[in-house]
């Protein structure tokens, strides 16, 4: 199968620690890179991931809290210093463009490429915001102290592989192969019809990845998340700080696990840990008690979908 990897660059929350970096991830889907959130120091972690800056053209920002955007101006400046010439597309709430324009004008004077801002929807409905031949990206409505949304990456299923034995046996010409891959049947010169499923191997299933941070518990998103291969869900607090989670519109590890269980996802990864936890094992234990296939996010973790 073609590559679909998620690189965790940072999984901490607002207060800096020596253990975790602020929120940021890189998705490598068929060698095309997408960034989710860009906390302070994200470009350093990007370097450490050994992914190529040149393959990044789309950045998705969940919300306008500093621990999710303070690394953005530094990354954009570095790309200009490196001589980038092709556009960078940033998907964020509309206020980010207003905030970033003066910084770009001041710190990135003479920037070598265009920065294109795409305003995220503000209503409480999932919407398609990006579409190419390999993937679709949808918003996930979240509830936080400022407008916020997560992102659902849905890989488009690749075309099925042709059965070489049938192509040779039926002497199907080369020009017809693409249409067969796309679902066409084949009729021989003497009128015999061969159904498409006789001519191809079954196509591989498209994979999916969901990112939900920052948010309180949102069970109404379960239908949207149903069956995703990997769900990254914030777990800022444990049960010991459940009142604080309610107050700040964050989630507990148990709530993240409940979302994963009800949505019947393949794997849960929890992150966005509060700095008050020196050891996140307590969060992992609380989540695994509800959804056993849970991992702790950590910098450098690579998820292979």
Functional labels for PLM-detected ranges:
Residues 1-49, 85-87, 151-153, 160, ...:
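Conserved beta-strand hairpin/beta-sheet module of binuclear metal-dependent hydrolase folds
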Residues 9, 124-131:
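Local beta-strand/beta-hairpin segments that build beta-sheet-rich folds
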Residues 40-91, 119:
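Active-site metal-binding motif and surrounding structural segment of the metallo-beta-lactamase
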Residues 11-12, 41, 64, 95, ...:
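Active-site metal-binding loops of divalent metal-dependent hydrolases
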